Regions:
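N-terminal signal-anchor transmembrane alpha helix
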Residues: 18-44
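Core segments of alpha-helical transmembrane spans in multipass integral membrane proteins
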Residues: 32, 52-87
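Aromatic-anchored segments of alpha-helical transmembrane domains
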Residues: 33-36, 105-115
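Non-cytosolic membrane-interface motifs at loop->transmembrane helix junctions
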Residues: 53-55, 121-134
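Juxtamembrane helix-break-helix junctions at the cytosolic face
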Residues: 83-98
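Hydrophobic alpha-helical segments of small multi-pass membrane proteins
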Residues: 101-111, 129-139
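Membrane-water interface at the C-terminal end of transmembrane alpha helices
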Residues: 137-155
Length: 157
C-alpha cells in the first residue's frame, strides 16, 4: 500500500515513468482521444450534442437547443484544459501518469454514476455512453500496470 501511494503521489515529480511500459504507450492514444473529444465539443457547430451524441436538438425550442450547445462547448473547454494537463504529464512529468490514470478512471466512473441518476435523452446510444465502461476497465487495468515497477528500468526522456 505504501508503494502504491508513493507512486500515485511522488515526493518529487520527474519525467521518469516508474510503471510497465504498456501503460505509458496506452497513455498516448488516450491523450489523443481526449484531445479529439474536447476539440469536437468546442469546434462542432452543435458542440457534438446532436451530430455525435444524438440529442434531438431539432425538437427543442431555439433557446433550449442553444443552451445545450453552450453547455457542451463549455464542457469541451473543461475537457481541453484537462487534456492539456495530460499532454504536460506525457511530455514533461511522466511520474504522474499513474495519478492521471486514477483521475481518468474516477472521472469515467463519476460520469457513469451521474448518467445513471440523471440520464440524457438521446435518439440512439451516444458513443460516450457505449464507450464509458470499456474505457473505465482499460483505465483501471492501465492504472494497475502503471503502479507495477518496470522490470527493464524506467522510461524517461
Amino acid at each position: 500500500m505504501k508503494h502504491i501511494l508513493a507512486t500515485l503521489f511522488p515526493k518529487q515529480i520527474t519525467n521518469t515513468y516508474p510503471g510497465q511500459k504498456i501503460a505509458l504507450f496506452v497513455f498516448v492514444p488516450l491523450t489523443l482521444m481526449l484531445t479529439f473529444r474536447s476539440c469536437m465539443h468546442l469546434i462542432a457547430p452543435d458542440g457534438g450534442a446532436q451530430s455525435i451524441a444524438t440529442i434531438p436538438l431539432d425538437t427543442y425550442s431555439a433557446g433550449a437547443a442553444a443552451n445545450v450547445i453552450a453547455i457542451f462547448s463549455q464542457w469541451g473547454l473543461s475537457q481541453l484544459l484537462l487534456t492539456l494537463l495530460f499532454i504536460l504529464v506525457l511530455v514533461r512529468y511522466r511520474s504522474l501518469i499513474p495519478l492521471f490514470y486514477l483521475i481518468f478512471a474516477v472521472e469515467m466512473f463519476g460520469r457513469m454514476a451521474v448518467g445513471h441518476f440523471k440520464p440524457v435523452v438521446t435518439l440512439e446510444t451516444a458513443p460516450g455512453a457505449s464507450s464509458n465502461m470499456p474505457l473505465l476497465i482499460a483505465a483501471l487495468i492501465m492504472l494497475g500496470l502503471s503502479l507495477m515497477p518496470s522490470k527493464s528500468g524506467d522510461a524517461s526522456d
